[in-house]
């Protein structure tokens, strides 16, 4: 009797363990299935933070090579997606490289490995590794490259150095009173009404709208052939140009009318929260040589090319990571005492004219915080795959001192 009971209990313990194991395995499979992310989905999520559409027109950002439907294993972040970095991705089992600079900048007529660009792209394709570039999409972001430089320098009262022009649109639409909040909510969720550090910004006016449905219509209100008068709300919102299509779609989806009346206007206002470069003020003013030593220390520089000393103390500082000679004029207009950038030519230094201290700190050096910056963003947002930083210094410029 006892042996039969023991066998019965033992049998059920074994079955219970098998059942427990079965359940755990299937729960894990379910979790893993839910959390898998494709490259296309990854880019969509990245764009919620750093919209690729805010990149400069000349730039080449987004997915440069790779299958957007492939599932992500791991992500490697780098400054330049060179062949050596692609090999590093292979070793780290990363099938996505998120790079700052686009390895493909202009069109490729062939991919045979005859130069450094083709070698990197060919190796990525052969190993099924996708390359995604951000470049000026991150440059133009308020909290992008230049904001990080300002943070490292301890600047405050930050403003965009070269605000984007012809970047803002205004939408005006007319909605029955009872549906105004519904339409506004849809517009806000699509990205309209964001102005600096405020969102859901709009302006509304009450009025009377008229219309007469004719043959072929399917009116939400009224009858065919009869003129209708409706109490309506005029809603006005501002948005960035690259959001236009998504905002119009959201408005039409939420609006009750078959034919939605709306106008879109280009406005002359500069976008004060998107653009290249940034400027702000140091906590305390510095002598020029003291400032240069301060910059050398913060950026771990061996050398700084600079214009002649002005004899003025440094308080207001402008920065533009990468090639930034085009920002000298803006730095002067904003009465900056110093301007940090890179790739300035011989004649660019003449434009200082004893009014500003121009500092060329090197292209790579000026953008050196980008990899860490992206690592912090991705590590916080994505938890279903490993994110790592490239250990390879891709700076092509060397100094003999």
Question: Whereabouts are the PLM-identified features?
Answer:
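Cysteine-centered motifs
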Residues: 2-6
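N-terminal low-complexity, intrinsically disordered patches enriched in charged
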Residues: 10-11, 371
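Aromatic (phenylalanine/tyrosine) cluster motif
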Residues: 8-10, 16, 20-22, 33
């Amino acid at each position: 009797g006892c042996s039969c009971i023991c066998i019965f209990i033992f049998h059920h313990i074994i079955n219970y363990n098998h059942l427990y194991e079965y359940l755990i395995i299937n729960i894990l499979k379910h979790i893993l299935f839910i959390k898998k992310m494709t490259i296309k989905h990854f880019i969509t999520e990245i764009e919620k933070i750093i919209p690729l559409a805010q990149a400069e027109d000349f730039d080449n950002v987004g997915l440069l090579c790779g299958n957007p439907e492939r599932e992500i294993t791991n992500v490697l972040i780098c400054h330049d997606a060179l062949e050596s970095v692609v090999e590093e991705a292979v070793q780290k089992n990363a099938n996505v490289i998120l790079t700052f600079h686009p390895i493909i900048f202009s069109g490729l007529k062939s991919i045979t490995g005859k130069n450094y660009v083709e070698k990197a792209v060919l190796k990525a394709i052969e190993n099924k590794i996708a390359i995604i570039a951000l470049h000026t999409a991150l440059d133009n972001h308020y909290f992008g490259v230049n904001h990080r430089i300002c943070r490292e320098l301890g600047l405050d009262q930050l403003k965009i150095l070269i605000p984007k022009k012809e970047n803002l649109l205004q939408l005006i639409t007319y909605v029955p009173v009872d549906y105004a909040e519904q339409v506004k909510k849809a517009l806000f969720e699509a990205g309209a009404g964001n102005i600096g550090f405020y969102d859901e910004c709009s302006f509304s006016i009450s009025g009377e709208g008229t219309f007469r449905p004719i043959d072929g219509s399917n009116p939400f209100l009224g009858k065919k052939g009869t003129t209708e008068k409706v109490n309506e709300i005029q809603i006005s919102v501002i948005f960035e140009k690259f959001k236009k299509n998504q905002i119009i779609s959201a408005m039409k989806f939420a609006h009750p009318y078959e034919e939605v009346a709306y106008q879109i206007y280009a406005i002359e206002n500069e976008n004060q929260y998107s653009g290249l470069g940034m400027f702000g003020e140091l906590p305390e003013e510095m002598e020029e040589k003291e400032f240069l030593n301060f910059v050398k220390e913060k950026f771990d520089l061996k050398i700084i090319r600079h214009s002649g000393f002005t004899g003025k103390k440094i308080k207001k500082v402008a920065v533009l990571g990468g090639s930034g000679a085009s920002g000298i004029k803006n730095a002067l207009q904003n009465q900056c005492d110093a301007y940090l950038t890179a790739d300035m030519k011989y004649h660019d230094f003449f434009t200082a004219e004893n009014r500003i201290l121009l500092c060329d700190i090197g292209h790579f050096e000026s953008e050196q915080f980008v990899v860490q910056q992206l690592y912090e963003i991705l590590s916080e947002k994505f938890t279903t795959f490993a994110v790592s930083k490239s250990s390879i210094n891709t700076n092509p410029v060397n100094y003999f001192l």
